Amino acid sequence: MRRHLSLVLGSLVIGLALLIAPGASWAYPFWAQQNYDSPREATGKIVCANCHIAKKLTQAEVPQSVLPDSVFTASVKVPYEEGIKEIGADGSEVQLQVGAVVMLPDGFTLAPQDRWTDEIKEETEGVYFTQYSDEQPNILLVGPIPGDQNQEIVFPVLSPDPATDSNIHFGKYQIHVGGNRGRGQVYPTGEKSNNTVFTAPAEGKVASIDAGDNGASVVTIQAADGTSTSETIPVGPQLLVNVGDSVAAGDAITNDPNVGGFGQVDAEIVLQNPVRIYGLLAFFAAVAIAQIMLVLKKRQIEKVQAAEGNF
């Protein structure tokens, strides 16, 4: 019941947002939160890719190792060509929005703000972080936010301490990262957005191109047997066909207006036991002392040999 209520309220919020700002370039993580218990499927695919079909590069930078109960940053880069714009929901050109999801290992969470350094505060200015769910504080989301200012998104992370949580162990862990720029090509309902290419539903000739609702175009294709099939093209994509053109099923009848895309990448991080570090430092110190002693002993022997040679 609670899940359905959240879905209804969320849908109302999105509907109002689209009415108020129809030209915005939305990339809602809301859909993933409402439709999937986890943002990562058993196959390893992050579910954002179900709507953001186009693939683009995403990069992640994390420390090689961290100590328990320490604050570090995970950086997600969602690069794209500066100045580029995309088609908004109303067909107008809008700035790209970006977003990111970081799936941290269990126990790792968003660092509390009172432990952020001045550098972290500067890097995260204007960025709002949310948890995927109350039960999954290790999965962090950002977006949509303006892409022209945030092609690199920095996540402040707090590492767990095995000394205070018996479920946490020292060792190597994986971090799963997803980054997106721009709107999706498919809605969660399965319908195409106006940010994708439209194809001919059947083979035949374009019989008519009529004006539809809200600036859409209705392309009617008549097959050789006389049957007709229509495809509604929303405002945004540009038609590539004219009345009388012959098309095959699956042929593109519009351009592809999409300029964005989604990408995912995995990274590794080691939760390091400080005792091992101290032991390693002690080992290095012992080796250094042993080498110094060997050098001193060698010089002592050389002096003795030199003294014996004088007699």
Swiss-Prot record:
What GO terms describe the biological role, i.e. biological process, of this protein? photosynthesis
User: Mind telling me what this protein is named?
Assistant: Cytochrome f
Instruction: State where heme binds.
Output: Y28, C48, C51, H52
Q: Matching Pfam families, A to Z? A: Apocytochr_F_C, Apocytochr_F_N
Stated role: Component of the cytochrome b6-f complex, which mediates electron transfer between photosystem II (PSII) and photosystem I (PSI), cyclic electron flow around PSI, and state transitions.
Membrane-spanning intervals of the chain:
277-297
The cross-references to HAMAP family, in alphabetical order and at most eight, read: Cytb6_f_cytF
Q: Which GO terms describe its molecular function?
A: electron transfer activity; heme binding; iron ion binding
Where is it mostly found?
membrane
- Assembly mode: The 4 large subunits of the cytochrome b6-f complex are cytochrome b6, subunit IV (17 kDa polypeptide, PetD), cytochrome f and the Rieske protein, while the 4 small subunits are PetG, PetL, PetM and PetN. The complex functions as a dimer.
